[in-house]
Amino acid sequence: MTIDAKHYDVIVAPVITEKATMASEYNKVVFKVTRKATKPQIKEAVEKLFDVKVKSVNTLVRKGKAKVFRGSFGSQSDSKRAVVTLEEGHRIDVTTGL
């Protein structure tokens, strides 16, 4: 199984929040991914990088918040998250590095 550099470009970071931790009980892992990443690309990257079988991938786009910085208005960038459901018997420990 070969790992290409493109797999590292798809997944940005794991999301470690209370909600994501609760989802891990149901074999789900949440990752921050690039905006242009598609579901098949995310599935392939997770399977190659973590050596697991992916059951499904759900994505969502979080719109950036409007912010005021030193009196000028701006907005944070939009971000994309992927909720990856793993097959039974497979686990990913996101607290360890790649």
Swiss-Prot record:
Cite the record's note on assembly. Part of the 50S ribosomal subunit. Contacts protein L29, and trigger factor when it is bound to the ribosome.
Question: Does the keyword Zinc belong to this entry?
Answer: no
Keyword Plastid among UniProt keywords? no
A cellular-component GO term for this protein: ribonucleoprotein complex
A Pfam family of the record is: Ribosomal_L23
**What protein family does this chain belong to?**
Belongs to the universal ribosomal protein uL23 family.
What does the UniProt function comment say about this protein? One of the early assembly proteins it binds 23S rRNA. One of the proteins that surrounds the polypeptide exit tunnel on the outside of the ribosome. Forms the main docking site for trigger factor binding to the ribosome.
Name by which UniProt lists this protein: Large ribosomal subunit protein uL23
Its lineage reads: Bacteria, Pseudomonadati, Pseudomonadota, Alphaproteobacteria, Hyphomicrobiales
Check the record and name the InterPro entries matching this protein. Answer: Nucleotide-bd_a/b_plait_sf, Ribosomal_uL23-like, Ribosomal_uL23/eL15/eS24_sf, Ribosomal_uL23_CS
Question: What gene is this protein translated from?
Answer: rplW
Keywords, in A-Z order: Ribonucleoprotein, Ribosomal protein, RNA-binding, rRNA-binding
GO biological-process terms attached to the record: translation
**GO MF entry, a single one:** rRNA binding
